[in-house]
A protein has these predicted regions:
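Non-transmembrane, aqueous-exposed alpha-helical and coiled segments at domain scale
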Residues: 1-433
């Protein structure tokens, strides 16, 4: 069985929490796109784990984790992430972590380029809100054929790799010295860096596509873990305020290394309210006062898992969520952080947008979204703790009414609801997985 877990909104929906739960019954968890530019947070007891590159299934000892073809991997960051988990007693070996030989390496200069360009753009206020982790530059060089893939580290003693390294270095030094006046990198330094990464990761690098095909043939349960959400997809998001990869479920099998493999289920994860990190149009933040947003941000601890940046927040946006649901083609919906709203006497929901005098019910990321205003309905809050609820019937009537209002606006049932950060603080209804 092949199941994708994806984000319906801007990311930070709680995918890591859902993956961690589903991984209890899974054999393999695969990250299929992105890099270390976002984080998935998993809470186990008193321990909180923030995973930027490693799949959320790494916390389960019987699960094999895969970094797939579609990723760009900062190996220095991966080393630190592995060491941090090992320091907490989490075993990581070539048996439970496999790196695709087709995945792209995020080279040291990609971070440098990202930082320099974002700093340049900030001078006139045109920055994109990059995480400055080199993701766009790693993907750019992938498509320009001016970078390495992980499998190349296994062939550093062969002449064709040396030729490619020289070609890459010459091109990159021209860019960095010509555009940004940086000191050029030497070939010995580049080769030494590659050799160090090969020594650290050669045992982990393999044909993960073949591994996954065999697993599916043996009827293993495979989870595909997306990074970010539909609004950050390079094609279907709010361009240019997107990530540099495809965040949608349809890309999952391709980025995992098993193109053509059919998805059994797609879980779309959304939050009980709206959040966004980074620049770009975000209509939901126009709906309420600054004090309301500050209270919500504190209640939900809405700060970026990868960057620590305060998230932009607003009410649940049904217009954006319908579009994200359509992009992901989800047949299951997980609603997270419902408990964060428990203190509110009244809860706003965005039902449509207003563009001058025109009512907008359909989300169009190619339109001018800066002049949209949110239209809200108010539903009564429940003002009581729900973190102990383990069945839908245990929820207060107004909490059920809030969920059912969202279901009606989305035209889709919600099957999973989290009522706290702990592993056991959730409930299901209808046909879950």
């Amino acid at each position: 069985m092949l199941t994708a877990v994806t984000g319906i909104n801007w990311g930070d929906e709680g995918k890591g929490r859902v993956i961690d739960l589903l991984a209890e019954q899974a054999d393999i968890v695969v990250r299929y796109q992105g890099g270390n530019n976002a984080g998935h947070t998993v809470v186990v007891g008193r321990d909180k784990y923030v995973l930027n590159l490693l799949p959320s299934g790494i916390l389960h000892p019987d699960v094999t984790c895969v970094l797939g073809d579609g990723m760009v991997i900062d190996l220095e960051h991966l080393t630190k992430e592995i060491e941090a988990l090992r320091g907490k007693g989490i075993p990581i070996t070539p048996e439970n972590l496999k790196l695709s030989k087709r995945a792209t390496i995020s080279m040291p200069w990609h971070r440098v380029q990202d930082e320099l360009e974002e700093a340049r753009l900030e001078k006139d206020g045109s920055a994109f809100g990059s995480t400055r982790r080199g993701i766009a530059y790693a993907y750019s060089d992938k498509y320009r054929k001016k970078t390495l893939r992980l499998g190349d580290l296994l062939h550093l003693n062969e002449g064709y790799i040396h030729n490619r390294l020289h070609m890459m270095l010459d091109a990159k030094n021209m860019e960095l010295s010509g555009c940004y006046h940086q000191e050029p990198m030497s070939y010995p330094a580049l080769l030494s860096w590659c050799e160090n990464q090969a020594a650290a990761f050669s045992a982990y690098i393999c044909d993960t596509g073949a591994f996954l095909r065999d697993a599916l043939a043996d009827h293993k349960k495979v989870l595909l873990e997306a990074q970010l959400g539909a609004m950050r997809d390079i094609d279907y998001g709010i361009f240019p305020y997107t990530s540099s990869s495809s965040t949608i479920s349809a890309y999952g099998p391709i980025g995992a290394g098993i193109p053509g493999a059919p998805l059994s289920h797609v879980v779309g994860v959304l939050k009980a309210y709206s959040t966004c990190v980074g620049a770009g149009p975000f209509t939901a933040e126009k709906a309420m006062s600054e004090s309301w947003k500050d209270d919500l941000r504190r209640a939900g601890n809405e700060y970026g898992a990868a960057t620590g940046r305060p998230r932009r927040v607003g009410p649940f946006d049904a217009v954006a969520s319908r579009y994200g649901l359509q992009c992901q083609n989800a047949d299951r919906i997980a609603l997270t952080k419902l408990d964060v709203l428990s203190s509110m006497k009244e809860i706003p929901i965005i039902t449509e947008y207003l563009q001058h005098t025109k009512h907008i019910k359909d989300f169009d990321p190619t339109d001018n979204m800066d002049n949209l205003l949110p239209v809200i309905d108010i539903v009564p809050g429940w003002q009581q703790d729900i973190s102990h609820c383990r069945s839908y019937d245990e929820l207060p009537d107004n909490a059920k009414r809030y969920i059912e209002t969202i279901e009606k606006l989305l035209g889709h049932e919600i099957q999973f609801i989290s009522v706290g950060a702990e592993r056991n603080q959730y409930l299901t209804k209808g046909e879950w997985l």
